Amino acid sequence: TLVGFLGTARIHLQIDVGFGDVITPGVQELDYPTLLEFDAPRLLGYTPETTIAEKFQAMVVLDMANTRMKDFLDIWLLAQGRPFSGPVLADAIGATFRRRATDLPTRTPIALTPAFHSTPVKHTQWRAYLRKGRVQGAVPELDVIASRIHAFVMPVVGSLTAGEEFLHRWRPGGPWVPGED
């Protein structure tokens, strides 16, 4: 985390730098939001599809030990807020799991089941994350988030494990519908 000052205002900036990750369909140019009316700096960054793939892969690997509540919120927010091409998301998930030498799940990962999200410990972690992260707006409970992530990610994973193309598109908030954009 970097701390900068604009006058007397303290500004925190966090930058994650990754090496060796596979970015699908490729690096994306992003406009970094500005506080004042200056031109937005252009940065190279991950695609939303790669972000989802990496966070989902962590959910699969970490299993019950997962404490990364931000990953749940991030995937849910992305699925709620933008459309996705099924083939592109499938490519990103497949490439990330291959690169990280992780088998694709053949059944629902524990992180997306009641065995995970209904435990008091996970409920406490979720509430603490929302409070500490100062998450704004109405955010569902972890069980609802997990159910929506399941509806978003698992049809793609099912196609990958079956060796089939996933020729669907996602509208913001879902569900998947047949056809490509």
Regions found by a protein language model. Name each.
Residues T1-D181:
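Structured mid-to-C-terminal alpha-helical surface segments
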